[in-house]
Amino acid sequence: MFVQEEKIFAGKGLRLHICSLDGAEWLEEVTEEITVEKLKEKCLKHCSHGSLEDPKSLTHHKLVHASSERVLSDTKTLAEENLQDNDVLLLVKKRAPPPTPKMAEVSADEKRKQDQKAPDKDAILKATAGLPARSTDRTVAQHNMRDFQTELRKILVSLIEVAQKLLALNPDAIELFKKANAMLDEDDEDRVDEVALRQLTEMGFPESRAVKALRLNHMSVTQAMEWLIEHADDPAADAPLPCENSSEAAGGLATGEAETKPTLGAGAEDPKDELTEIFKKIRRKREFRPDPRAVIALMEMGFDEKEVIDALRVNNNQQDAACEWLLGDRKPSPEDLDKGIDTTSPLFQAILDNPVVQLGLTNPKTLLAFEDMLENPLNSTQWMNDPETGPVMLQISRIFQTLNRT
């Protein structure tokens, strides 16, 4: 019987199961004193029938301990690698490292990237320095980018006036708007995203604080969570929002008026004046609410509070855009926001001629939606998805896009 040389020397004998990637399996009997490199050499000789074809083949392979999935170090002994009898080892060929690119190839690749790179502003100015200046109306080009939002606001202002006149002709207009006013109170109290509120309460935040945080942060769960963490130890965080107090006061006033009005008699007040007062109340409840975080951030830059609120109102509560407005020419001005579209323009006439819009203007809910979108553009999505107001907004958008392309 053939006896391997390693068994002649002292040392604990190990029986190791070797597996190669081609599916071959065999048993190697070695002592724990030999190195992993020697074992690897024996394994390669077994695979190549007793001779190594490539001298570098030893460095191109590695032994992996199957159960622990670790690569064995060539310089350590089997004892140092803590191999046990009947362990399974995998003989694996190492991945060849990617070839190092030649300098000529690197230079050519860099040159190709430079050729494909778009020129920056400095390069454009340098290349066009010798060209004659041409009169380009850059103001119009910039205006077209925000044309839809600007025109939509003007359209809403004019449509609100038309809707008020149409609804005032309805004999039940006062009752309709009293109900709308009550709906508005309920809407203000209940407008909390239930899913977002549940997420915050499941995190352990008190419900009252979570509601306040969501209202302050436009129903953004992430921003509301940040606010709750920042104000965790702030006792003022439990105080109600100013808008909640004003809503309660307005609601009480409306209730009081409703109770006293019947006693004054039917002819005590002109219905038109009463409608005007209701319209004013609705508009007060839909007043623009600046983002408190944006107000604080912009005031810390040194801007006056009134200027900051005007900037946020003009730029739909977008802090970055408001900052640019404050630093720029401040156009459009807050006064421009209350100007309607030219009522003789083809665009406005096309909108008024649309049957869906005509029908929608007789619905008090449409007027409420227009008022809300006018002062809080972030709520536009809510009204676009509403079954009553959504079709009206869709028709306005389609008419605008159609006429804008012609």
From Swiss-Prot:
GO annotation, biological process:
protein maturation; protein ubiquitination
Q: In which pathway does it act?
A: Protein modification; protein ubiquitination
Write out the ranges of the annotated region (Disordered): 95-122, 238-272
Gene Ontology terms, cellular component aspect? cytoplasm
Q: Which cysteines are joined by disulfide bonds?
A: none
Matching entries from InterPro entries are given as: STI1_HS-bd, UBA, UBA-like_sf, UBA1_UBAC1, UBA2_UBAC1, UBAC1, Ubiquitin-like_dom, Ubiquitin-like_domsf
Enumerate the CDD domains for this protein.
UBA1_KPC2, UBA2_KPC2
**Limits of the UBA domain:** 186-231, 289-329
Q: What residue stretches are annotated with the STI1 domain? A: 354-393
Keyword set includes Repressor? no
Q: Where in the cell is it found?
A: Cytoplasm
Say yes or no: keyword Transmembrane helix present. no
Q: Which PROSITE patterns match?
A: UBA (PS50030), UBIQUITIN_2 (PS50053)
Q: Name one GO molecular function term.
A: polyubiquitin modification-dependent protein binding
Q: Where is the composition biased (Low complexity)?
A: 238-257
UniProt keyword annotations, A-Z: Cytoplasm, Repeat, Ubl conjugation pathway
Domain (Ubiquitin-like): give its ranges.
14-98
- Could you tell me the superkingdom of the organism this chain comes from? Eukaryota
Summary of subunit composition and partner proteins? Component of the KPC complex.
Q: Quote the function comment for this protein.
A: Non-catalytic component of the KPC complex, a E3 ubiquitin-protein ligase complex that mediates polyubiquitination of target proteins, such as CDKN1B and NFKB1. Within the KPC complex, UBAC1 acts as an adapter that promotes the transfer of target proteins that have been polyubiquitinated by RNF123/KPC1 to the 26S proteasome.
- Note what the entry says on domains: The UBA domains recognize and bind polyubiquitinated proteins.
Protein name, as recorded: Ubiquitin-associated domain-containing protein 1
Which lineage ranks, top first, belong to the organism behind this chain? Eukaryota, Metazoa, Chordata, Craniata, Vertebrata
Instruction: Give me the gene this protein comes from.
Output: ubac1
